[in-house]
């Protein structure tokens, strides 16, 4: 029984962490057993058994755990039962709610259609040769000119050796005679050093100038592509981001942008120039030495290229495995560090290290395969080139014996082939790295092709709104996250301008969904939503979201200063305006007491601040935004009573003469609302003022109010435990069974 209680508590804590960390996978220690000697239930079995609905607890599990349930563990087990709903969702996402969790894709382009390589290259060339940047096109043209000069100088080098050797032979009568040492040394030094030195220096000069000129083109392309991807990701709808893990997405973008620079250089300065040089060398050999030399050269190069391409394609799968392992390792590290406190709570440092090491081991295995196959590729390339070079040299020696070629021709042929071997060796590397870079870039360009589900209509007009006209109206709105599971069923209500309206209801009634629909994170399947008398689907998203401020339940801050996070509400605001909203939110004095004042770093996700301080920052920056409409999505539900009262006092000053909608769980926070709307099963069940709704003792609101009030009283009443003892076991069992069944009606991760 103790084991059951321990795991129940762990599940409940894990469920809470899963709710908050919607962009990361939850780390939960496997369940060893339910209790005693009964059947053992593993996490994957829980997911497999829930066939009817992914979030349901199997009836067999309910029965077994109920039979082994002790009286003292009822509350803990109830929390655990709710948390059990999470397990199947980790395997497969069935809920797309605003803060729902689920199986996030470690592959950022999972479920997306790949972009063809030719389209990637075409898109790349559009950045290399931009129509709106003549200065960059001029740089590309100049770079190509320097490239041609460098290749020409490379071809000249073997000819320098040929003419030097031939002239020396002529001076000594067909045989190289070193009897006259001064003349010989002078002639060789002059011919080789001047010709070779000038050619090599010229080639190096052209290459370096080319790199310097083209550098701005490459960096500009990288910057523009990275910016476009980043902006596009922000424009995608919430559903896309809820199905992707942040760590994997970040790594994919990083690898893709790094691959851009390499592919740009490879396409413009390696692959095409190598092809040009191969044709040039083959033509020279055909003209100077005969068709046999050209055929052997082309045959060697063709075999070399075919072997390189075939082996590289085979090796590509190992790079894909490395990327996947790299993504998994990155996700594990980021998720574990973001959940630092949770790891400490359960003493799971070693478990996290072992889990992380498992991904690293997978990466190591794939990397070793890649390294060993690379050695095989390099040896094969060297063998093919050596065979071709040997054949060419044999043909050249036969030509010298026959008198059709000179010793200088032998030197020239050898020099041309060795000159060609440098880019050929690099060709293998370029092809391998280009293939790998294209794999990395595929995700980047695939993301750019993803179309958002929430977008402006053609020629959408900006929202015309003022605080005096900021009415909010829902007209027969129907909405469901998953087909067949309705969240809102024909809901209709209106919030007059400048009024405070509260929306309350039980879990799963659709309260938070209203916020997401009004902010257009989602579109209703039926019905319309109006703001200032205008259908929000007919106005631009930018103007709509500028007019609506949101104070979320879990305020997440940027890893920056307090001042930066406050200023984020309106980045053009003056320091005086920032200080004013901080005072209005009751935060100014607390900030001044900090060692660095407004320059205090808040830490990752604002974890250096208390919950109350984070909520006040969220309220302050919403005020700084100065929207006509403010939405409070259970903004104080996670705070203690004292902090809640302080923040509610600050809110009263904020909402004066401003349209405000409060999504509330604690009814005590909305007693002063102009109107309270009670939702039940996705419909407006009741509406009225606090006192008006309490006047009906059988109303849903009245029952909720008295239930919450009795909980507070019972919490402080020392006789409550004695009263519990008088409740019969049978009544307790029936009550708990009913609560368990009710707890699994929703998805368990959100308010649906």
UniProtKB/Swiss-Prot annotation:
Activity regulation description: ATPase activity is stimulated by glutathione.
Residue range covered by the transit peptide: 1-22
Enzymatic reactions: (glutathione)4[2Fe(III)-2S] cluster(in) + ATP + H2O = (glutathione)4[2Fe(III)-2S] cluster(out) + ADP + phosphate + H(+)
Residues that hold ATP according to the record: 481, 505-516
Modification Phosphoserine, positions: 336
Subcellular location: Mitochondrion inner membrane
SUPFAM superfamilies: ABC transporter transmembrane region, P-loop containing nucleoside triphosphate hydrolases
Residue list for modification N6-acetyllysine: 216, 251
Domain of life according to the entry: Eukaryota
Residues that coordinate or bind glutathione: 315-319, 378-381, 428
Keywords: Acetylation, ATP-binding, Disease variant, Membrane, Mitochondrion, Mitochondrion inner membrane, Nucleotide-binding, Phosphoprotein, Transit peptide, Transmembrane, Transmembrane helix, Transport
Residues where Phosphothreonine is found: 342
GO BP: intracellular iron ion homeostasis; iron ion transmembrane transport; iron-sulfur cluster assembly; iron-sulfur cluster export from the mitochondrion; negative regulation of reactive oxygen species biosynthetic process; positive regulation of heme biosynthetic process; positive regulation of iron-sulfur cluster assembly; transmembrane transport
Membrane side Mitochondrial matrix: residue ranges: 23-140, 207-259, 312-382, 431-752
UniProt cross-references to Pfam families, sorted A to Z: ABC_membrane, ABC_tran
Domain ABC transmembrane type-1: residue ranges: 140-436
Example GO molecular function: protein homodimerization activity
Membrane topology term: Multi-pass membrane protein
Predominant cellular place of this UniProt entry's protein: mitochondrion
Free-text function comment from the UniProt entry: Exports glutathione-coordinated iron-sulfur clusters such as [2Fe-2S]-(GS)4 cluster from the mitochondria to the cytosol in an ATP-dependent manner allowing the assembly of the cytosolic iron-sulfur (Fe/S) cluster-containing proteins and participates in iron homeostasis. Moreover, through a functional complex formed of ABCB7, FECH and ABCB10, also plays a role in the cellular iron homeostasis, mitochondrial function and heme biosynthesis. In cardiomyocytes, regulates cellular iron homeostasis and cellular reactive oxygen species (ROS) levels through its interaction with COX4I1.
Disease connection: Spinocerebellar ataxia, X-linked 6, with or without sideroblastic anemia: An X-linked recessive disorder characterized by an infantile to early childhood onset of non-progressive cerebellar ataxia and mild anemia, with hypochromia and microcytosis.
Assigned protein family: Belongs to the ABC transporter superfamily. ABCB family. Heavy Metal importer (TC 3.A.1.210) subfamily.
Quaternary structure (record): Homodimer or heterodimer. Interacts with C10orf88/PAAT. Forms a complex with ABCB10 and FECH, where a dimeric FECH bridges ABCB7 and ABCB10 homodimers; this complex may be required for cellular iron homeostasis, mitochondrial function and heme biosynthesis. Interacts with FECH. Interacts with ATP5F1A. Interacts with COX4I1; this interaction allows the regulation of cellular iron homeostasis and cellular reactive oxygen species (ROS) levels in cardiomyocytes.
Protein name as it appears in the record: Iron-sulfur clusters transporter ABCB7, mitochondrial
Encoding gene, per UniProt annotation: ABCB7
């Amino acid at each position: 029984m103790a084991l059951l209680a321990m795991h129940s508590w762990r599940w409940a804590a894990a469920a809470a962490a899963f709710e908050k960390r919607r962009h990361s996978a939850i780390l939960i220690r496997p369940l060893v057993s339910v209790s005693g000697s009964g059947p053992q239930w593993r996490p994957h079995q829980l997911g497999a058994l829930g066939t009817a609905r992914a979030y349901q607890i199997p009836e067999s599990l309910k029965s077994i755990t109920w039979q082994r349930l002790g009286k003292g563990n009822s509350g803990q087990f109830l929390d655990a039962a709710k948390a059990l709903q999470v397990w199947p969702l980790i395997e497969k996402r069935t809920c797309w709610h605003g803060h729902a969790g689920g199986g996030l894709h470690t592959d950022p382009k999972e479920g997306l259609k790949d972009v063809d390589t030719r389209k990637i290259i075409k898109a790349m060339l559009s950045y290399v040769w931009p129509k709106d940047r003549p200065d960059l096109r001029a740089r590309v043209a100049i770079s190509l000119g320097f490239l041609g000069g460098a290749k020409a100088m490379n071809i000249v080098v073997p000819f320098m050796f040929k003419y030097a050797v031939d002239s020396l032979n002529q001076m000594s009568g067909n045989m190289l005679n070193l009897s006259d040492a001064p003349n010989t040394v002078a002639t060789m030094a002059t011919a080789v050093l001047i010709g070779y030195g000038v050619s090599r220096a010229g080639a190096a000069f052209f290459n370096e100038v080319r790199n310097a000129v083209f550098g701005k083109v490459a960096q500009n392309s990288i910057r523009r592509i990275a910016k476009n991807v980043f902006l596009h990701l922000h424009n995608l709808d919430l559903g896309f981001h809820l199905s992707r893990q942040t760590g994997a997405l970040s790594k994919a973008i990083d690898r893709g942008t790094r691959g851009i620079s390499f592919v740009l250089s490879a396409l413009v300065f390696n692959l095409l120039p190598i092809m040009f040089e191969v044709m040039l060398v083959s033509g020279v050999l055909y003209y100077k030495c005969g068709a046999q030399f050209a055929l052997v050269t082309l045959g060697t190069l063709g075999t070399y290229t075919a072997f390189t391409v075939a082996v590289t394609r085979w090796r590509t799968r190992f790079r894909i495995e490395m990327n996947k392992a790299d993504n998994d390792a990155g996700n594990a590290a980021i998720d574990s560090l973001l959940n630092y406190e949770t790891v400490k709570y359960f003493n799971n440092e070693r478990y996290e290290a072992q889990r992380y090491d498992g991904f690293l081991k997978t990466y190591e295995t794939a990397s070793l395969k890649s390294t060993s196959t690379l050695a095989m590729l390099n040896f094969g390339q060297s063998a093919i080139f050596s065979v071709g070079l040997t054949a060419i040299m044999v043909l050249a020696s036969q030509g010298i014996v026959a008198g059709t070629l000179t010793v200088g021709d032998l030197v020239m042929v050898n020099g041309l082939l060795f000159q060609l071997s440098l880019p050929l060796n690099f060709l293998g590397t370029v092809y391998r790295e280009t293939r790998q870079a294209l794999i990395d870039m595929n995700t980047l360009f695939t993301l750019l092709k993803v179309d958002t589900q929430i977008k402006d209509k053609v020629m959408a007009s900006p929202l015309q709104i003022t605080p005096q006209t900021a009415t909010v109206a829902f007209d027969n709105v129907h909405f469901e996250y998953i087909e067949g599971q309705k969240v809102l069923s024909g809901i209709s209500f209106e919030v007059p301008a400048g009024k405070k309206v509260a929306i309350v209801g039980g879990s799963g009634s659709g309260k938070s969904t209203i916020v997401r629909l009004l902010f257009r994170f989602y579109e209703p399947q039926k019905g319309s939503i109006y703001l200032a008398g205008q259908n929000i689907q007919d106005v631009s998203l930018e103007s709509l979201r500028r007019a609506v401020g949101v104070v979320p339940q879990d305020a997440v801050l940027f890893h920056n200063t307090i001042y930066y996070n406050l200023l984020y509400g309106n980045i053009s605001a003056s320091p005086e305006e920032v200080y004013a909203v901080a005072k209005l939110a009751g935060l100014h004095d607390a900030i001044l007491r900090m060692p660095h004042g407004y320059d205090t770093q808040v830490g990752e996700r604002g974890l250096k601040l208390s919950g109350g301080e984070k909520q006040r920052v969220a309220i302050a920056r919403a005020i700084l935004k100065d929207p006509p409409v403010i939405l409070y999505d259970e903004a104080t539900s996670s705070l203690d009573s004292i902090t809640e009262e302080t923040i509610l006092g600050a809110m009263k000053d904020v909402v004066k003469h401003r349209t405000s909608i409060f999504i509330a769980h604690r009814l005590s926070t909305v007693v002063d609302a102009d109107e309270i709307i009670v939702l039940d099963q996705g419909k407006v069940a009741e509406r009225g003022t606090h006192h008006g709704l309490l006047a009906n003792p059988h109303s849903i609101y009245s029952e909720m109010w008295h239930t919450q009030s009795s909980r507070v009283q019972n919490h402080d009443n020392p006789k409550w435990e004695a009263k519990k003892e008088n409740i019969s076991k049978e009544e307790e069992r029936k009550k708990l069974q009913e609560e368990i069944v009710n707890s699994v009606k929703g998805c368990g991760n959100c308010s649906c």
